[in-house]
Amino acid sequence: IVAIKDHINLTGNNPLIGKNLDEFGPRFPDMTEVYNLKFRALAKEISKEYFEYKEGVYAWFTGPTYETPSEVNFAKTIGADLVGMSTVPEAIVAKHSGIDVTAFSLVTNLAAGISDSPLSHEEVIEIADKTSKTFQNFMRSFLGQINLAI
């Protein structure tokens, strides 16, 4: 389980493309701190009871295929610690709307080129199932105390 501290959008897409709705947020929102620092500090403290806390930069790919070894290498070269197919568009929209954001990524497999084993969706599901109870308990505790960070 890794707390996301920043992201890199490698999709060539952005959920804010199109007409801006000013009532939701500015045309060009600041993305300096998408992932709330106070929330991450709280998560770090609470995680001590559940798992070793780690933070990382998440690179967003479109999917639905797993990334190639070259894509993973490129992401690593430009500063990414994790790769995946989710999270970033929701974080962008939330930040645009003035919502404080925190995000966690469950690392379910070693990306292509890191391991000699072929990637398997079944393995991803299996690891997610094994970790789900720990993550649920952590999130209950985190959400129960989040008002302390606001």
Residue ranges and their predicted role:
Residues 1-118, 122-150:
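Glycine-rich phosphate- or other oxyanion-binding loops that anchor nucleotides, phosphorylated ligands
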